[in-house]
Amino acid sequence: MNISKKALSLIRYNLQGSLKKNGINIWRYVFKGVEKGTGVERLFFIELIVLNPYLSPSDIVLGFDSRVSVSSEQLQNVLAGTVSAQKMMSETLVVPSYICVKAGILGAGARQLCFYAPVKDVKSSLKSFYFEVGRCSFSEERLSGLISQNPSDIQEHPGFLSDTGLISWDLRYEIRLDSTVGFSGKSANWFPVGINTVFAGNISIDGREYSVLPKNSFGYFDRIFGPSCPDNLFHLSSSHLTSVITGKLLEKSSFAVHGVYKDKVSIVAILEDKKIEFAADLSKRAYKSIYDCSTITDSVDGDKLHWTISASNKQYIVDIDVFCIASDLFVRTLELPNGKRKVIKFVSGKSSSGEIRMYKNNRSNLELIEHAHLADCLCEFGSLEVPEE
């Protein structure tokens, strides 16, 4: 894998110290597959999530579960008849602890399958990035796995937040463009380490088989880790860009937007030989960013969600517009390390259309560097959800 040493260290990074019992660690892969026989194209995702792994190393603990806390003294009072059992019973919210693999499909008919395990069931390496859990394995060059959930499994464990069915994959990947600029903070970190990643292999879901081809996989790989995640989620990323100016596919181009950090989003945009990085961990004066996600009504497609970003410093301006059909968006949930049933609830989908423009600020005028159409863009938007007491 021909990437920088810093990017490789970020890929290999695992939770250390107190984060083993109070932290989240995510490896996320996104790529396109083409259905065999029909040629239908779909956007897939695979995620490895490590959440408070050593808080409960031998058992899976879901934060959606609750446990009844009963002391021996309370139990004696119930037996003596001085306190009713109903009055004594009180719920104690638990803190989650598990390893989870999520894999699914985005866009129309979106769905995901999830597999959970305790950290004791994981095989891993300290010398390189390697995780093996259940029938899934992750390494620096390959992804393989199989997840199967039947209706009785989900009925017994609704907290799995998984659809029923079967998904399997066998993929190799290579990072073509890496980025070690993103956001680094005490509470959260994000890096688009494989901002342009090529995938090759096969993936199937419920009997439908898809080929993943290097020339049009348009892949993306990022890392999220730390004691927590931002309360508000705003994400866009794509490596499928076509120049409006020349009409050519921009093979050495990608972009990623992620936040919200300190009321800003971090932006990394690589358009052929131009690279712009706006990191939210820089000083407030380093750049300005305006972002929004709103609903609009289209006469053809109905309601759409519209992501907009405009960011600038003294040298460059980047404007991004992305649209998703609202009915194709998939509601997902990410548990947070601190428990108390706190989650990030967000919509996730594949873009229906989008554009990116990059300008150079020449003081007296703006020079258009590139204007490109976006496709196969991962789009996410959501916020912290806290249960009512």
PLM features: what roles do these ranges have?
Residues 1-389:
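Structured soluble/peripheral alpha/beta segments that form catalytic or ligand/cofactor-binding pockets
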